[in-house]
Amino acid sequence: MTGVLPVALEDATKVLQALLLTGKEYVCVMQLHGSVSSEVVQQVLSEFVGEIYQRPPLRSSVKRRIRTRWIYRISFLEMQENNVLFSVGCQAGTYIRKLCHDIGEALGCGAHMRELRRVRTGPFTEEKLSTLYDLADAYAAWAEKGDEFLLRKLISPMEFGLSLLPKIYIRDSAVDAICHGANLAIPGIVKVETEIKSSDIVAVFTQKGEAIALAKALLSTEGILDL
């Protein structure tokens, strides 16, 4: 597999768990084991949009028990002979090679994943990709000349990784308590985004836009505003 792989440094590693909540997008080449028309392929692909059941493949890092995952969209791109190119937006933890296998079963001919490229993880897209060579050059410029420009161009602020999460903004007087593990009380909240649901994971920010913590909402947006 090639494509987007976010790498976090120091305290920003805590943001990686938030990326699991924001979904991923892939472009995949699926090889069919028999001849099927493109119209039939498109019809079957559309049937996999929504909540699906998956058992992780034999080579996986988790227990092989059936679980549900969401497929937000599947787009048929093109087909050459028995090779189908499609893009898919899905919940984190979805196994695309297992998805290809299941699509092949639904088609009645069998199929396997031939190539896979991740084009988005949360807010990180291909447009923001950097190579290890880019990083090595940027580090050399900093180490040899003290020039931080290239490093700052490559490294996104921690707050960018949280940009797709619902946010709560708090008063400066509440920051220290939150940083020491205290619960956030209603008086400490300055602004809250809409569509927060109870039990959602939210990002807590200062009024200056600095990320402070990840938290679990005990109330919805409406519940917070009513208090």
Which residues does each predicted region cover?
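Non-catalytic RNA-recognition surface used by pseudouridine synthases
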Residues: 1-136, 179
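Accessory RNA 3′-end/elbow-binding domains used by RNA modification enzymes
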Residues: 2, 22, 44, 64-66, ...
